[in-house]
Amino acid sequence: MDIKELQKIMQENGVVGAGGAGFPTYMKLTDKAEIILMNCAECEPLLKLHRQLLEKHAYEIMKTFDMVAETVGASQAIIGIKKSYVQTINALNQHIEEFPRVKIHLLDEVYPMGDEVVLIYEATGRVVRPGGLPIEQGVAVFNVETLYNVYRAVEEHKPVTSKYVSVVAEVENPVTVKVPLGCTLEEVVAQAGGTTVKDPVYFVGGPMMGRIGNGSDPVTKTTNAILVLPKDHVIVMKKQRTSSIDLKRAASICCHCHTCTDLCPRH
């Protein structure tokens, strides 16, 4: 299979990044990619979707990862995964010898290791300039679920019509479920036995980078998790707070030492 053929399959089956901004997958398939990375850092608290999916479908995802590397001509295919995800690592090690091109890079348990710029530096030593794209450094990064969707499109000829979503926090039975695209957040939460608090707030995504949603909002191709929280939870209150309040607090506390900027992984 050549790059154009794989790109066509991705377009026809609606495969996009299953997290973040939902970047079209076919646009990452280029012969400029010297290294491809699988992002299984998953550093948002409470979220386990990627490691669960990779553990359950290790062979299928690794096979697809190797196929993508061969198609674009990448010399390395690196799985970036935190060293604490022991069960998932064990599942990968059962098949790693079948794919000589694929390597596992163990990551430290720090935040924000899942940020692709941080991941690229930790796994390859390459630095993406501020505002730049990974491909400028010869790297393409793929989400675990995205690669599983590539597998389903190539091997099973199935388009992306469903999404894996973790439902956690104030629910009866925290669970990861497979649901059709377009169903509401309330319908997904019902699969976890319903909420355990009155007037719940549906927080879409992880507690660090997520947003407040509405129960009638639809599941999209980038919906990874739903956190059900009480309305007075500190995370909810922080998201509802205006930025001007945070700026005033920062101005009253900051001594302009510049250390936070020096240490910021995005700087």
Predicted regions and their residues:
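Flexible, glycine/charged-enriched surface loops at secondary-structure junctions
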Residues: 72-79, 197-205, 264
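Iron-sulfur cluster-binding cysteine motifs and their immediate structural context
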Residues: 259-267
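Short alpha-helical segments in extracytoplasmic peptidoglycan/chitin-binding modules
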Residues: 182, 187-189, 202, 264
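Hydrophobic alpha-helical positions that pack around
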Residues: 78, 83-183, 191-196, 206
